[in-house]
Amino acid sequence: MAQKTLLIITDGIGYRKDSDHNAFFHAKKPTYDLMFKTLPYSLIDTHGLSVGLPKGQMGNSEVGHMCIGAGRVLYQDLVKISLSLQNDELKNNPAFLNTIQKSPVVHLMGLMSDGGVHSHIEHFIALALECEKSHKKVCLHLITDGRDVAPKSALTYLKQMQNICNESIQIATISGRFYAMDRDKRFERIELAYHSLMGLNHTPLSPSEYIQSQYDKNITDEFIMPACFKNYCGMQDDESFIFINFRNDRAREIVSALGQKQFSGFKRQVFKKLHIATMTPYDNTFPYPVLFPKESVQNTLAEVVSQHNLTQSHIAETEKYAHVTFFINGGVETPFKNENRVLIQSPKVTTYDLKPEMSAKEVTLAVLEQMKLGTDLIIVNFANGDMVGHTGNFEASVKAVEAVDACLGEILSLAKKLDYAMLLTSDHGNCERMKDENQNPLTNHTAGSVYCFVLGDGVKSIKNGALNNIASSVLKLMGLKAPATMDEPLF
């Protein structure tokens, strides 16, 4: 088995048994009908733990393409950190240990919620308890959310933090994320949060009383004014500080204010030394230890093909170009040797339901051209099912599927003539469910399975699997050995 191969990603076209509001089911799709009758196919998981996301969370194009290209599950920061903490690995984490061992006082700061977008309260609690085991005094600097969770939910999360408080662990400050997590260089906001860290803006109220006093002024969690509580005298020289958010964009400014030598946002208290660490890499210019460094993704599908001196072409329209280049290549921006990239402009319309065919025809022409040139691997993304599905327009989504189906017909026909193998799947679903339980338009991705079809010499059946099984399957069609880092193929 060694064939030139097509990897076709039909973005946003998923599997769903029910036909109600299912644009894929209701579309006229002779090519799909032919594939169902003549090609082996299976179902592929695209969400939750199968792609490294939290259990039950819908997949997305970035994660999906990363998983496809890597050929293995790349756990996202939230899941990776949670698994590490569940396995009690923090006690052996060098960045964590080195940071807390430098001072009897450890300051922990981060977003106090279970929203899972920037942080998770379980991480906050786990770090505090591990510091306590090392006989440290722990100062908690709580950032209230109200954006990724309900606007007035802080008291619920506060109770969880108070449950671990004792003589060693105390709540030192509180601030709404509007102030402590600015990302737009509005340093007048950061300055207020910074002042509370320094022991300014004292309130005589308890943390719960203070939150309630803000609610009484119609101030919700996101906008709670920064304050510090009794018995907290501010950060001191030679103390340790860990910011527990795993997402970097809204953590940079406050960490810069605390630790960067070059800072012009506002006048700061001068420290000889603070021992700062961050949960994940926040900025390439930051010198601070990182508890959970970025995972290097090597031996991706594109890299392996390049190592064998074979040619490849990655094709998509604007909306999905980054996904078939940067993301599918494991976060590598520069093309590999013999890797050609074709960018087709997406139509300039306000919303894609106005032109559900998008640029699928132009994408198809580029694919056909590469096939005629004999390119060894062609990776192509059809954006229609996802981008039109996001509009919530059922009729337009049906047309989007029909447009993709027509394009697939041309590609499949030429593939058979030129002896190309083909693997067709989706990175996640969308257009197969266009209304929610209340009959309102549903515009988000679905948390379900997608189809996988294979055309290849000797391939009679394929197993159910997940996106991490795609790369090794493509390499097998090409007659190439998959690296040990990749998971097993589907056949």
UniProtKB/Swiss-Prot annotation:
EC number from the UniProt entry: 5.4.2.12
Matches recorded under InterPro entries: Alkaline_phosphatase_core_sf (IPR017850), BPG-indep_PGM_N (IPR011258), Metalloenzyme (IPR006124), PGAM_B_sf (IPR036646), Pgm_bpd_ind (IPR005995)
Cofactor binding remark: Binds 2 manganese ions per subunit.
Alphabetized Pfam families for the sequence: iPGM_N, Metalloenzyme
Stretches assigned to coiled coil: none
Cofactor(s) the protein requires to work: Mn(2+)
Binding site for Mn(2+) 1: 386, 390, 445
Binding site for Mn(2+) 2: 11, 61, 427-428
GO biological process: carbohydrate metabolic process; glucose catabolic process; glycolytic process
Gene Ontology terms for molecular function: manganese ion binding; phosphoglycerate mutase activity
Function: Catalyzes the interconversion of 2-phosphoglycerate and 3-phosphoglycerate.
PANTHER family referenced in this protein's UniProt entry, alphabetically: 2,3-BISPHOSPHOGLYCERATE-INDEPENDENT PHOSPHOGLYCERATE MUTASE
UniProt name for this protein: 2,3-bisphosphoglycerate-independent phosphoglycerate mutase
Organism: Helicobacter pylori (strain ATCC 700392 / 26695)
